[in-house]
Structure formats: structure tokens, C-alpha cells
Amino acid sequence: MKTFIGIMIPFLGTALGAACVFFMKKNLGNLVQRALAGFAAGVMVAASIWSLLIPAIEQSEGMGKLSFLPAFIGFWVGVLFLLLLDRLIPHLHVGSNQAEGPKSRLGRTTMMVLAVTLHNIPEGMAVGVMYAGFLAGNAQITAASALVLSLGIAIQNFPEGAIISMPLRAEGESKGKAFLGGVLSGVVEPIGAVRTILAAQLVIPALPYFLSFAAGAMLYVVVEELIPEMSQGKHSNIGTVFFAAGFSVMMTLDVALG
């Protein structure tokens, strides 16, 4: 039951964020959107470092001076994996008029949902890897540390849910369809987590690689999507301030509770 709750918490964060479309009459202002993107980016960077990369290095201490190697390799594989998906799947980032990936006849709404869905994949995998390690009895991964990562991702999923549902509403979709689009963008997370847990026999022996893989993929999302979003438009420090806030929240959660 703990595992089920843990893998569903991030999805709940997305759904709650998407539900903002029912309570907010206007589209997200530019400053609000930049603040939300900055906060989400801060949470993801902190989670990648404290919950994924550092544990990956610690679990490779037996390799001596080469203990960094699994984290280095996994990190780069994660970055390249997301880069490949970006090239193969047509998608449209919020606030952009230029679609990425191969040419497609898909509508703007579908491609906007695909963009967020694509970048939610590593988050689901990260949660799955943590719970796979916990269920396998890994001494360095506790129920608390796995739950902290789930909570951290849920916190950053809340603004992400709003960031996708509100623009969909502004595009002319009904509130129900805009909410559904936001929710669907998060479905991939519990699915990815479950698939990773089911593949535990493959994951556990290479746990440092999988932890750093998730970190690399998440940091790719931060640099490729969230940093441009928090920096777009007229210069403002709002995105940077909220990045620091998100980073601090996730760091505190991980150190205090994990």
C-alpha cells in the first residue's frame, strides 16, 4: 500500500494543478507562469542531486576512485535518451508557436500535452527506481527517502498541471477538456513507475546507473524546457527567486525527512 500511495502522489499533484482551470477565470499571467516554472525547476534540480545523483555515487563506493563512473554514464544516457525522444515525438512547448520534432498534423492542444507528457517520463522512472530499491531491501533507500522524492515531484507537478491546463483553456478548450489534458500529461508517471518496479530484477543490480539516468533526464527537462520558460519575456528575477525557493524546499525535504 505504501508503494501504491508513493507512486500515485506525483500524479495527484498534476491533477490538483490541472484543477486550477476550474477556479481561475483568466490565463496565467507571464510573471505567474515564470514563477511556477522556476519553482518546478528548482525542485527538479534539488531532487536530481540529493535524491538521485548523490545516492548513485554513494552506492558505487566499492569502486574506489571510479565510484563516479556509474553516475557519469547513467547521467549521460538519461540526457541522450530525452534528446532522442525530443527528436522523435512531435510536441509544442507552452508559450511557443514553433513545434519541435518531426512534422505532424497533430493539433496544437495534442502537441502541448505531448510536450509535458514526454518530460514526465523521467519523473515516473525516478519514483519507480526509488521504490524498486526500497522493495528489494536496499539499505541506502528507505521508505522515507522514496516518499520524499514522490512528494517533491508532486510539489513541482502542481504548477506543471496548471501550466498546461490554463494555456489549453486559453486556446479555446472547455474547462473539462483543459483539465483532462493536464491530467493526461501526468498519467505517464505512475505507469512509468510501475513498469520500472516490475523490471526490478533488471534495475536493482544496476541501481546507480538507473538513479543517475533519471537525474540526467530530469535535468535535461530543466535546461531544455523550464529555464527558457522562467526566463522568457521582459527581464525579471521572479523565475530565479522561485527557482531558489523550489530548490530550498526539496533540499529541506530530502535532508530533514529522507
What is the meaning of each model-derived region?
Residues 1-258:
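Intrinsically disordered, metal-sensing/regulatory segments
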